[in-house]
Amino acid sequence: TQGGSKQVTHLEGLTEALKFGMDEKPRLVHRLDKETSGVLLLARTRNVAKHLSKAFQQKKTRKIYWAAVAGVPTPNLGTIKYGLVKSTNKDFEKMRCVHPGDVKKIDGAKQAETDYMVLTQLAKRGSWLAMVPVTGRTHQLRAHIAELGHPIIGDKKYGNMSQQNLGDGWGAKLGGDLSDDLHLHARYLKLEHPITKKPLELVADLPPHMAHTWKTFEWSSKDFSDDPFSDFLE
């Protein structure tokens, strides 16, 4: 969504074309990794952008991501609290997980927290997760779930061959004709409308490559609510 390392084309650079007759360009109020699909919110005015940015900062929004991962995390419902610190080599940057107790001891490390739930699984070979980024660190969901040994399908940065993988058949794409694209999708966003003050819920359909995987595994988007964590707590 934003310009970054070696990233030339990004949404922020296209906002002039999204004015649609308005005086102001729309403003990004949060971001998605360049390979992540799903709900992305832009504000039409400066005042609305300020209001929405504050809502994200104060955690007054609710974000649910869907992912297909190798293997099946245990337990089926849990919270990951590894800290994250940027690790750089000559080729690329990635986030490294550190023990929560070591965060204050490591320069640049930040606390991070992710809730996850296994919605369904393909034996022990792969599973469909819902994830909530309680904090909003760079690559948080990808790094956290990979640290458990269950990298997201198509994640070339955190799911390489050196990554522990408990999913039998990962190298064979779990027995299906699956896309190499990242299987991480911002499915659901809930927040207060900045003008009407009423609850606003936004849902994004799966992108084609993930829809194909869901069809291959006989998973259906209709089988679970947009916020399955709320269903569990009721």
Locations of the language-model features?
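Short alpha-helix capping/helix-loop boundary micro-motifs
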Residues: 125-127
